């Protein structure tokens, strides 16, 4: 007890509560502010001037407020142990579904246009049947020629200039080729082989089938050979077909194609009936009249409330097997593409083929992707920063950009547009009568495009935001053996076909959401600005006990104070220079006035020797400094000495 009393008395003695030596709150705050390690509080005490002091007070109070706010959030998050579960039933927009018949036009509508082409194709096939049975696999090649044989004038010009050929005799230094339509033969010398498009060794050339194409001047020609006669004929027929269709106006092609009522037999959506009025026409260059369900052109997009095969879109298509062109496509059925309402249906790129006599179930799962743009990736948000015109007038995509770029290069290099892609304003599609070298130019450009020697792959970018549908396809025979008779009889009666309908003319399709889960893939930066500042602040606090207030102190000292000192120094130097300049101007004498001559009657400078005239003039006033007169030296008069001497003389006398 005595020891505690002694400590209490010592404290009262050293820290009196009353009296003149008792500390006040102001003294305590001054001591704290001058000795604390809290940077902002110390700056309040040592700052000079009320403005700086109030600025530091505001910074410090704001920092304290941020600390308490963050602490409150952290404590609330730490002590919150409740769990909430939210269940929502959402609807998903049903995608647009575009349906095309693989066969683009009715056979009776194109028979007159394709008569000569079909005739030549049959003759070529007959020749191949008798001479090319059992052909082995071959590689894709092309051979450069510089001369062509004489052509018959009884066939179309393109069929003359682009004949199908077969390699006959192979020697060490040349190859003999024959035209399948005319049986004419000519040889390709080894000198021409060295200039070929993709060089090939003559020793490896077997019996090949290909066709010849030339430029507009026929100075350079190429024979393309294929690994199969079927592939060669399909490609040769397709080029001739495109050449013919490029000259047909869209109005006539619309009449030649299938109508929505011809193509669509039955339609159901979410258990409700639909018909051709719910479809929008879409003209495709290769597949003719296509039709889009839920296109959104009227401003309404259908929503799906329930997933499963019992819902969604169900269709029965009539594809008319006997109406197919046997040389244009070797497959039969329909092409379907699922896409967003703002996207262009690229049928040939991502279209799904549906076969006849089959029920096809297509389950959908939608996934949205969001990628980070620069500097994390070189993607584009909407294509506005891509230096390529969108010829499809739809939302941007990488494929749309590549096709548009190729069409632009085609017009720039070949002078005309490729038929399978949109036609830009002011251009026209290529056809042989007006552009005889377009096929040669197209293959040259296609080779550059495939080998990425065009600028398209550098110009076009991927999209940052995209929506993709994952398709799950399942097949079943349709109609079944048990239901075949009544289904076909009923459809024959509805369409008035007099029992000519068979199951190979029909295809059943069901497109539905497997579930209504929307999958989202998004990118986030691994190191954000907040993470960077947090890590840097942690290192500064760990090793230097520094915070953002330290940077404010540095900003005040090294920026504000140093700039103030520098400005004050140069201002002082400027004032000194100006003061010295004024002093030099005040000390500098004024220049003398030297007005002389006969016109000056007042004064004239001295002449040597003087004349009478100058002697009568006044001398010029001296403008220089007047010499000072020294004070008289009175002792030089020696008056007293003179008087003394006189007195002395008198006295002597």
Swiss-Prot record:
GO terms for biological process: sodium ion transmembrane transport. One of its GO terms (cellular component) is apical plasma membrane. GO terms for molecular function: ligand-gated sodium channel activity. Strongly expressed in gill, liver, kidney and rectum and more weakly in heart, muscle and intestine. It catalyses: Na(+)(in) = Na(+)(out). Keywords: Cell membrane, Disulfide bond, Ion channel, Ion transport, Membrane, Sodium, Sodium channel, Sodium transport, Transmembrane, Transmembrane helix, Transport. It is a multi-pass membrane protein. Residues 1-54, 568-653 are cytoplasmic. Its main location: membrane. Residues 582-608 are annotated as: Disordered. Disulfide bonds join 100-290, 214-221, 267-274, 379-464, 401-460, 405-456, 414-441, 416-430. InterPro entries: ENaC, ENaC_chordates, ENaC_CS. It is found in: Apical cell membrane. It holds the Pfam family ASC. Originally identified and characterized by its inhibition by the diuretic drug amiloride. The chain crosses the membrane at residues 55-75, 547-567. PANTHER family: AMILORIDE-SENSITIVE SODIUM CHANNEL SUBUNIT GAMMA (PTHR11690:SF19), AMILORIDE-SENSITIVE SODIUM CHANNEL-RELATED (PTHR11690). Component of the heterotrimeric epithelial sodium channel (ENaC) composed of an alpha/SCNN1A, a beta/SCNN1B and a gamma/SCNN1G subunit. This is one of the three pore-forming subunits of the heterotrimeric epithelial sodium channel (ENaC), a critical regulator of sodium balance and fluid homeostasis. ENaC operates in epithelial tissues, where it mediates the electrodiffusion of sodium ions from extracellular fluid through the apical membrane of cells, with water following osmotically. Belongs to the amiloride-sensitive sodium channel (TC 1.A.6) family. SCNN1G subfamily. This is Epithelial sodium channel subunit gamma. It comes from Neoceratodus forsteri (Australian lungfish).
């Amino acid at each position: 007890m005595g020891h505690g009393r002694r400590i209490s008395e010592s404290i009262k003695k050293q820290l009196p509560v009353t009296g003149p030596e008792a500390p006040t709150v102001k003294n305590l705050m001054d001591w704290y502010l001058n000795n604390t390690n809290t940077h902002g509080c110390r700056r309040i005490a040592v700052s000079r001037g009320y403005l700086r002091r109030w600025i530091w007070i505001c910074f410090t109070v704001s920092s304290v407020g941020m600390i308490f706010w963050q602490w409150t959030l952290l404590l609330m998050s730490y002590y919150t142990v409740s769990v909430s579960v939210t269940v929502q039933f959402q609807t998903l927009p049903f995608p647009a579904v575009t349906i095309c018949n693989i066969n683009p036009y009715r056979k009776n509508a194109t028979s007159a246009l394709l008569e000569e082409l079909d005739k030549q194709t049959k003759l070529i096939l007959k020749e191949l049947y008798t001479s090319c049975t059992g052909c082995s696999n071959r590689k894709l090649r092309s051979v450069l020629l510089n001369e062509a044989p004489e052509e018959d004038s009884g066939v179309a010009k393109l069929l003359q200039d682009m004949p199908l050929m077969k390699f006959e005799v192979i020697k060490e230094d040349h190859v003999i080729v024959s035209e399948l339509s005319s049986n004419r033969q000519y040889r390709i010398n080894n000198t021409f082989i060295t200039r070929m498009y993709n060089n090939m060794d003559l020793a490896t050339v077997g019996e090949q089938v290909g066709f010849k194409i030339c430029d507009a001047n026929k100075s350079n020609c190429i024979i393309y050979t294929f690994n199969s006669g079927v592939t060669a004929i399909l490609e040769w027929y397709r080029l001739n077909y495109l050449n013919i269709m490029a000259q047909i106006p869209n109005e006539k092609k619309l009449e030649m194609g299938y109508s929505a009522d011809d193509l669509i037999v039955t339609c159901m959506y979410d258990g409700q009936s639909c018909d051709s009025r719910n479809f929008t026409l879409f003209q495709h260059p290769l597949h003719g009249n296509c039709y889009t369900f839920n296109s959104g052109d009227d401003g309404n997009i259908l929503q799906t409330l329930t997933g499963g095969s019992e819902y969604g879109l169900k269709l029965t298509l009539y594809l008319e097997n006997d109406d197919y062109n046997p040389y244009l496509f070797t497959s039969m059925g329909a092409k379907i593409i699922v896409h967003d309402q703002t996207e262009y249906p690229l049928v040939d790129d991502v279209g799904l083929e549906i076969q006849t006599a089959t029920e096809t179930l297509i389950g959908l799962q939608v996934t949205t992707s969001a990628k980070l743009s620069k500097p994390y990736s070189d993607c584009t948000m909407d294509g506005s920063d891509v230096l390529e015109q969108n010829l499809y007038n739809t939302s941007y995509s990488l494929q749309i950009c590549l096709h548009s770029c190729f069409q632009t290069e085609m017009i720039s290099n070949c002078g005309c547009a490729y038929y399978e892609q949109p036609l830009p304003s002011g251009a026209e599609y290529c056809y042989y009568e007006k552009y005889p070298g377009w096929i040669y130019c197209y293959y040259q450009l296609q080779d550059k495009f495939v080998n990425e020697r065009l600028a398209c792959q550098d110009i076009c970018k991927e999209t940052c935001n995209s929506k993709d549908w994952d398709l799950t396809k399942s097949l079943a025979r349709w109609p079944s053996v048990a239901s075949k008779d009544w289904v076909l009889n009923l459809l024959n009666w509805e369409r008035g076909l007099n029992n000519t309908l068979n199951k190979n003319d029909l295809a059943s399709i069901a497109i539905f959401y497997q579930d209504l889960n929307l999958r989202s893939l998004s990118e986030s930066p691994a190191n954000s600005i907040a993470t960077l500042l947090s890590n840097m602040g942690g290192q500064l606090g760990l090793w230097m006990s520094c915070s953002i207030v330290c940077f404010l102190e540095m900003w005040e000292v090294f920026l504000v104070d140093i700039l103030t000192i520098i400005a004050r120094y140069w201002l002082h130097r400027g004032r000194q220079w100006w003061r010295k300049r004024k002093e030099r101007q005040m000390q500098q004498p004024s220049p003398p006035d030297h007005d002389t001559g006969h016109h000056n009657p007042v004064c004239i400078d001295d002449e040597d020797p003087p004349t009478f005239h100058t002697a009568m003039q006044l001398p010029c006033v001296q403008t220089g400094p007047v010499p000072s007169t020294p004070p008289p030296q009175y002792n030089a008069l020696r008056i007293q000495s003179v008087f003394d001497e006189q007195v002395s003389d008198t006295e002597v006398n």
